[in-house]
């Protein structure tokens, strides 16, 4: 995708007066992000909006921890085309140096497209409301703390979210939810580090749609491979900094990493003791001391997956 950023540096900067970011992704569609910081930089208003592209889809393998992978079918069999419009404002405030509190709202529209010969038809009938336009409102709050408790411990970041969503057409279909995560980065030497993230989600009612369910992010499986009412997963990487590549254009660092993931979901009425795992590794490149690209290959009981990522930091 491509992005355009416009930043205004007025009299009051924290570090800027405001910023607009507009982008387009081939699969996800159009996206907008606006940042409006307070003059002292301790409070910020965010406005996020998106309109999906006609190619946007979400995987659906059914509910539960033991769903089949349908390896004999083509990938499209488990794909559901989704038309979405989203508007998500949020207000962020610094409580202390290490603590941030965010209050957010959401107004979302979802419509799953009817497509013949797809798995979703075996779960939902042709006239099911999932194939009509559904509007949702939501409210919530997130507390995040980044701190090093003791000098001998790594820097820890933990985040806790509590929220609620409701279907505007059917107000009785609403549910509260909670999420929690913990991440850390242990540096054994200048070149060798261990990074890890643990994350869990709990839905406190059964009135949610498949695209709102709790899921796990294991790199050897397709997205939303397992969904349910509760979820937990952890992924970890061992990273080796191989040094710098000399070139006349930009500073370029590179390295190797190996990773291992595990997790599972829980769904009412299902008895499962399985924990899913994936493993693999890859290479990373950092340029301008800011942007990192990752090329990875992860395997699981389903298959192997190649992934390319571009982002800030590692």
Language-model regions: role of each:
Residues 254-261, 274-278:
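Small/polar glycine-rich anion-binding or flexible loop at a beta-alpha turn
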Residues 266-272:
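Short, glycine/charged-rich beta-strand-loop motifs at protein surfaces that mediate ligand recognition
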Residues 30-31, 60-62, 73-77, 89-90, ...:
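C-terminal outer-membrane beta-barrel translocator/porin domains of Gram-negative envelope proteins
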Residues 272-287:
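A short alpha/beta connector and helix-capping loop motif
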Residues 9-11, 38-42, 96-98, 148, ...:
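Outer-membrane beta-barrel channels and translocator barrels
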Residues 1, 6-8, 24-28, 49-57, ...:
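Transmembrane beta-strands of outer-membrane beta-barrel pores
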Residues 20-24, 45-49, 101-105, 160-162, ...:
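Membrane-embedded beta-strand positions of outer-membrane beta-barrel proteins
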Residues 1-135, 212-216, 228, 292, ...:
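Gram-negative/organellar outer-membrane beta-barrel architecture
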């Amino acid at each position: 995708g491509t992005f355009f950023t416009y930043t205004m540096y007025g009299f009051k900067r924290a570090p800027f007066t405001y910023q607009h970011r507009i982008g387009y992704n081939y699969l996800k569609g159009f996206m907008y992000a606006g940042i409006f910081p307070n003059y002292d930089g301790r409070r910020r208003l965010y406005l996020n909006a998106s309109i999906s592209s006609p190619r946007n889809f979400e995987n659906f393998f059914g509910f539960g921890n033991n769903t089949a992978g349908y390896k004999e079918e083509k990938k499209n069999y488990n794909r559901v085309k989704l038309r979405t419009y989203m508007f998500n404002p949020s207000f962020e405030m610094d409580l202390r140096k290490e603590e941030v509190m965010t209050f957010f709202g959401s107004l979302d529209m979802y419509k799953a497209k009817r497509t013949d010969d797809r798995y979703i038809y075996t779960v939902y009938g042709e006239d099911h409301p999932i194939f009509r336009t559904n509007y949702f409102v939501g409210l919530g709050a997130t507390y995040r703390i980044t701190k090093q408790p003791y000098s001998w411990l790594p820097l820890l970041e933990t985040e806790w979210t509590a929220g609620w969503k409701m279907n505007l057409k059917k107000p009785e279909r609403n549910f509260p939810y909670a999420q929690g995560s913990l991440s850390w980065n242990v540096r054994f030497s200048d070149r060798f580090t261990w990074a890890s993230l643990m994350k869990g989600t709990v839905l406190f009612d059964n009135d949610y749609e498949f695209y709102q369910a709790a899921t796990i992010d294991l790199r050897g499986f397709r997205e939303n491979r397992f969904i349910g009412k509760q979820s937990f997963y952890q992924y970890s990487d061992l990273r080796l900094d191989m040094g710098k590549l000399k070139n006349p254009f930009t500073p370029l660092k590179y390295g190797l990493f190996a990773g291992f993931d595990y997790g599972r979901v829980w769904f009412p009425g299902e008895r499962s003791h399985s924990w899913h795992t994936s493993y693999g590794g890859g290479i990373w490149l950092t340029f301008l001391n800011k942007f990192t690209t990752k090329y990875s290959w992860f395997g699981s009981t389903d298959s192997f997956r190649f992934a390319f990522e571009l982002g800030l930091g590692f």
